[in-house]
Amino acid sequence: MSDSAKHSITYLRFLHLVQAIRQIPTFPKMDPVEDRLLTMLGVKWHDAQQVSVLEAMGLSTEISATTAHRRLKTLRQKGMIELDIDKIDSRVKYVVPTELARKYFVALGQAIDKAAQPT
């Protein structure tokens, strides 16, 4: 089997596993915009960057600031993010992951590992 075929199969396995993860009742149902926003936030958090609400609203050129702000609210309601107030300027709030978001990222990472394993 060629490398490109192996990579294709691995990727499709990963997508299948992600769909299964999204059906687990432990994790809230997220629409594509929420999922994209959480993914972009996860990249920033992985790089140990603090992300203010204002910065989060501008993370993607594909998502309007208003839509991003609405989705931040819904992600907060779903228990995926929290807001921490800046210690110096109380007007600034930082978006931080909850334990549930961390578990979600772990589940996705495990899906990558599982998809890459030969069958």
Region spans (language model):
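Amphipathic alpha-helical dimerization/coiled-coil segments
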Residues: 13, 18-22, 106-119
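Short alpha-helical segments that sit at the start of domains
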Residues: 11-40
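Short amphipathic alpha-helical interaction segments
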Residues: 62-77
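Short acidic, hydrophobic short linear motifs in intrinsically disordered regions
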Residues: 47-59
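Short helix-to-turn junction characteristic of helix-turn-helix DNA-binding domains
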Residues: 41-45
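A short, conserved structural fragment
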Residues: 76-86
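Short, cationic-aromatic polyanion-contact patches
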Residues: 86-109
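General nucleic-acid-binding
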Residues: 1-8
